[in-house]
Amino acid sequence: MLDARYIRENLETVEARLKTRGEGVDIALFKELDGRRRELLQQSETLKALRNKVTEEIARLQDKSQAAERKTEMREVSQQIKGIDESLRSVEEELQNFLLTVPNVPNETTPIGKSEEDNVVVRTWGEVPTLSFEPKPHWEIGEGLGILDFERGAKLAGARFTLYRGAGARLERALINYMLDLHTDEHKYIEMLPPFMVNRECMTGTGQLPKFEEDLFHMEGVDFFLIPTAEVPVTNIHRGEILKGSDLPISYVAYTPCFRKEAGSYGKDTRGLIRQHQFNKVELVKFTSPEDSYQQLQKLLGHAEEVLRRLQIPYRVVELCTGDIGFSAAKTFDIEVWLPGQNCYREISSCSCFEDFQARRAGIRFRPEEKAKPEFVHTLNGSGLAVGRTLVAVLENYQQADGSVLIPEVLRPYMGGAERIS
């Protein structure tokens, strides 16, 4: 959430930078609500100061009739204050609801653009393999090996659900454990295992609510949501807390299943594992000081890249433009993995700095020093990685002409020493 004072003092800048997202903000409504709030607040404070002053005078009055008259006047003032404060609460709630729908201001270094066509390729890693045979897409590989069952997945739950079996299930588990071990043992993240359902406050804190409720699975009868990403519960671990500056940066990693309606994806990626209602993901989350956040973003990005480097799978890093970054993000880098069966790069991780946008919504602050005034932290997160899409990348990049799939060396200890799925 943006700070109302920041918007007030930088109206033209905020409006111009939000327009680069392709979204306009009703600045006139903000000015009206903010002006009304400040006016009511001033009226309330003026009357409360008057009441306090007169109350002190009444205590010194010797004339009882005069004191009674002043008390009557103050009762009327108290009624005025009550009415003004009720109006103030109403306006503050309306302003708060408005601010919750305003996206984050893109960082000034974020490339300006309208869509993914304007994103900037930062670097590529690895050689795109030249195969001596026509590469298959992962769904054909998985079905041919009997490790992915799309038909039975649909029978169990409908479209965009998949049943993993045998070596497919074990490969998914191997990837999860490999990622967690890498991030905890070498990158020194603290592992978390959060609830897979969260309350409305969590969804509001990270920015999914109120604007994107249609893409969330909501539990009937109770006000819980299935998480769309571990970012939601892990970021909210410190909701409403004041952290020690000496503890920053705090780095968490969490494996969770993720649940998304994919409401706007009708007709997209209808085959395979790329776009599912339920999928596994290993998420990286950081809490940092404002001064350190963009340095930590590069570290987080590097940690996500390392997963693919050790798997020896080609990828590229893309910086998203203002028209393509998410609602809460100030800056985002995507990692896109090469998929031979589809002859293209596909997103496998999105690494973002949110500056204080989420922290302000969730009330996450820190003290730079022991007695210093609390400040909002900066939050960061990124996939490290999306597990299903990594499995897709393994199947397509390690496929062999005979239909088998070689197992990357780093995964073999997690696969009982097996070298091939056939």
Swiss-Prot record:
- In its keyword annotation, does this UniProt entry include Ligase? yes
Output the Gene Ontology cellular-component terms.
Answer: cytoplasm
Enzyme type, top EC level: ligase
Looking at the record's lineage, which domain of life comes first? Bacteria
One molecular function GO term is:
ATP binding
Q: What InterPro entries does the annotation carry?
A: aa-tRNA-synt_IIb, aa-tRNA-synth_II, aa-tRNA-synth_II/BPL/LPL, Ser-tRNA-ligase_type_1, Ser-tRNA-synth_1_N, SerRS_1_N_sf, SerRS_core, tRNA-bd_arm
Chief place where the protein resides: cytoplasm
Instruction: Kindly list the cysteine pairs connected by disulfide bridges.
Output: none
- Residues bound to L-serine are 229-231, 283, 383
EC number(s) for this protein? 6.1.1.11
Q: Which reaction does it catalyse?
A: tRNA(Ser) + L-serine + ATP = L-seryl-tRNA(Ser) + AMP + diphosphate + H(+); tRNA(Sec) + L-serine + ATP = L-seryl-tRNA(Sec) + AMP + diphosphate + H(+)
Q: Which pathway does the protein contribute to?
A: Aminoacyl-tRNA biosynthesis; selenocysteinyl-tRNA(Sec) biosynthesis; L-seryl-tRNA(Sec) from L-serine and tRNA(Sec): step 1/1
Q: Which UniProt keywords apply?
A: Aminoacyl-tRNA synthetase, ATP-binding, Cytoplasm, Ligase, Nucleotide-binding, Protein biosynthesis
SUPFAM superfamilies given in the database record: Class II aaRS and biotin synthetases (SSF55681), tRNA-binding arm (SSF46589)
Where, subcellularly, is it found?
Cytoplasm
Give the binding site residues for ATP.
260-262, 347-350
Per the record's keyword annotation, is Glycosyltransferase included, yes or no?
A: no
**One Pfam family, short name please?**
Seryl_tRNA_N
Record-level GO BP terms: selenocysteine biosynthetic process; seryl-tRNA aminoacylation
Q: What does this protein do?
A: Catalyzes the attachment of serine to tRNA(Ser). Is also able to aminoacylate tRNA(Sec) with serine, to form the misacylated tRNA L-seryl-tRNA(Sec), which will be further converted into selenocysteinyl-tRNA(Sec).
Relate the assembly described in the record.
Homodimer. The tRNA molecule binds across the dimer.
Q: Which family does it belong to?
A: Belongs to the class-II aminoacyl-tRNA synthetase family. Type-1 seryl-tRNA synthetase subfamily.
Record note on domains: Consists of two distinct domains, a catalytic core and a N-terminal extension that is involved in tRNA binding.
Q: What is this protein called?
A: Serine--tRNA ligase
Q: Which gene encodes it?
A: serS
